[in-house]
Amino acid sequence: MARKGLVERWKKPKKFKTREYTRCKICGRAHSVYREFGICRVCFRKMANEGKLPGVRKATW
């Protein structure tokens, strides 16, 4: 319930641009969000393993 309230508050426009911060589009997580994809590392890893992110592969060396 607390997270839902934070997500709703995050969606409202901010008075100052510097107060805006990135959140995951899927789960709403505020930390470790990749700008290029707009999702957090947890969702990124899950979606990459499922093959839902085109062009993303596991590194092998």
Swiss-Prot record:
Cofactor: binding comment: Binds 1 zinc ion per subunit.
A single Gene Ontology CC term: cytoplasm
Residues that coordinate or bind Zn(2+): C24, C27, C40, C43
Pfam families: Ribosomal_S14 (PF00253)
GO biological process: one example: translation
Family indicated by similarity: Belongs to the universal ribosomal protein uS14 family. Zinc-binding uS14 subfamily.
Protein name: Small ribosomal subunit protein uS14
Source organism (scientific name): Thermosipho africanus (strain TCF52B)
